[in-house]
């Protein structure tokens, strides 16, 4: 039987009772085309002269890789002319990117991490692109937006997704009614539906965390990991395996495929920061995807998608994945705060 393409899937969703709007459909297709271009650049590697770092830093104070900058430019150029967007925001830019006046403006906002896990670029480990779609406030329809218009809780996302550039290139997407996965057919140049309903098991025997930071964690996180390491004879009654790729897209993709819990918690080295990962274009889109796949996503004390952001590049502690494991970590935080 012939498989559906991304375009066919989106058209069917547009026709269905959920009524995906035509602007969102076209926007997702444009983002997907940009991800194909990024995938092509990633796959060329040293042959394309795209490996290595630049002398510049992004707004986060991180040294930019050549592919970081190229991926950011690809997404900006692909999305600014279509008439679907009012503005964009990126990990690589300090301020928002307004749609130029020479192009029509739409009613949506696009946020993205153009190349997540870029520290892995030069060592040929899976990396990816994360994106989130919000609706612009009605008061700004047809006019310029400001940073404040982006500061919406993750529960307001219209769509979210990521592309993972690995042995296969995949696009994982939610428009609020489950999670689907598409694989890039390189011969045909099209995204093909290969995963119709991605679900995360409620329980797991795998955790993903950077164990080298253990001495800096808060007690509830230490407690949970200690119990995982205790194995069958410990309070959780089962042996766990640890997995850590240092690429959020790759780690979350594994969890979507076979279950697990991903943790990038607050640590004591920077006590004034709530966490390391960015809320608006990392935690929120991944949180929506995980929840739509039957999992959970919290910052330790509450649901990530309920957080009201106060700045564009806000950071947050992230604990997401298999529902029962995430809820256990949440209980440990609640017990610690109550004592």
Swiss-Prot record:
One of its GO terms (molecular function) is fructose 1,6-bisphosphate 1-phosphatase activity. Its main location: cytoplasm. It catalyses: beta-D-fructose 1,6-bisphosphate + H2O = beta-D-fructose 6-phosphate + phosphate. Transmembrane segments: none annotated. GO terms for biological process: fructose 1,6-bisphosphate metabolic process; fructose 6-phosphate metabolic process; fructose metabolic process; gluconeogenesis; sucrose biosynthetic process. GO terms for cellular component: cytosol. Binds 2 magnesium ions per subunit. Keywords: Carbohydrate metabolism, Cytoplasm, Hydrolase, Magnesium, Metal-binding. Its EC number is 3.1.3.11. Substrate binds at residues 116-119, 210, 276. It is found in: Cytoplasm. Homotetramer. Belongs to the FBPase class 1 family. This is Fructose-1,6-bisphosphatase class 1. It comes from Bordetella pertussis (strain Tohama I / ATCC BAA-589 / NCTC 13251). The gene is fbp.
């Amino acid at each position: 039987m012939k498989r559906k393409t991304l375009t066919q899937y989106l058209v069917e969703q547009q026709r269905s009772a959920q009524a995906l709007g035509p602007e969102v459909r076209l926007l997702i297709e444009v983002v997907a085309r940009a991800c194909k271009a990024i995938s092509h650049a990633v796959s060329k590697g040293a042959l394309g002269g795209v490996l290595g770092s630049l002398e510049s830093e992004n707004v986060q104070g991180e040294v930019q890789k050549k592919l970081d900058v190229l991926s950011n430019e690809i997404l900006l150029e692909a999305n600014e002319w279509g008439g679907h967007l009012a503005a964009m925001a990126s990990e690589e830019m300090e301020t928002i990117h307004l749609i130029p006046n020479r192009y029509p403006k739409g009613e949506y906002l696009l946020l993205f991490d153009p190349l997540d896990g870029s520290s892995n670029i030069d060592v040929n480990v899976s990396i990816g692109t994360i994106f989130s779609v919000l609706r612009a406030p009605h008061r700004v329809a047809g006019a310029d937006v400001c940073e404040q218009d982006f500061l919406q809780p993750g529960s307001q996302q219209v769509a979210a997704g990521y592309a993972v550039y690995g042995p296969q290139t995949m696009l994982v997407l939610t428009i609020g009614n489950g999670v689907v996965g598409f694989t890039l057919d390189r011969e045909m140049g099209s995204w093909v539906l290969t995963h119709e309903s991605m679900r995360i098991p409620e329980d797991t025997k795998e955790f993903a965390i950077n164990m080298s930071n253990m001495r800096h964690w808060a007690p509830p996180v230490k407690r949970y990991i200690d119990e995982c390491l205790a194995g069958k004879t410990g309070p959780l009654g089962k042996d766990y395996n640890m997995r850590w790729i240092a690429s959020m897209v790759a780690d979350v993709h594994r969890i979507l495929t076979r279950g697990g819990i991903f943790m990038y918690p607050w640590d004591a080295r920077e006590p004034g920061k709530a966490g390391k990962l960015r809320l608006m274009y990392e935690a929120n889109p991944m949180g929506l995807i995980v929840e739509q796949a039957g999992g959970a996503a919290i910052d330790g004390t509450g649901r990530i998608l309920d957080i009201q952001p106060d700045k564009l590049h806000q950071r947050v502690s992230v604990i997401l994945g298999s529902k029962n494991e995430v809820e256990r970590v949440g209980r440990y935080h609640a017990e610690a705060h109550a004592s």
